[in-house]
Amino acid sequence: MKAVIFLVSELDYDRWTVESDNEKRFDLMSDEEVMELQNSGHIEFGGHTLTHVSFFDVDDERAREEIEKDKEITEKRLGKKLKVFAYPYGHKRKEVVEMVKECGYSFAVSTDTGSGIFTKDLFDIRRTAIDKTSLINFLRRISPRYLQYKARKYKDKF
């Protein structure tokens, strides 16, 4: 089993965190680092848009560009086809899910929403984001109660 890292193709730092949370800038992986990880055989890479946009904040034309161009750039960078896509911030809408399918992805993951059962909906698989955090918060996020809380919290949003 491989770990999956989702690449944002047109940024070289975590702009979304710096701008929204006033966090310190964190450089994203260089091409050399990406290739080293790919060549290790332990890492799979996935698409994650050009600029880490929220699909709630852009129209369909911009969403399609973010998905399609990111896939094209990242596949060229890696020299292989991408199988998996991650919706930035977990934000998705029906039209975006269809775009991801049309781009040829095999499945897509969200954050906080979607099924925890892999075979239920291949384009709405839930994953839990584990950011830089404490051990207590890590344990909280992997507990079943946390997943139930998140499912209730976002039930009507998506």
Please state what every model-predicted region is.
Residues M1-H42:
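Active-site beta->alpha N-cap acidic-glycine motif
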Residues S9-L11, T49-T51, Y89-H91, G114:
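Active-site-proximal loop/turn and secondary-structure-junction residues that shape catalytic pockets
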Residues V4, T49-T51, S110:
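Ser/Thr-centric signal marking residues that sit
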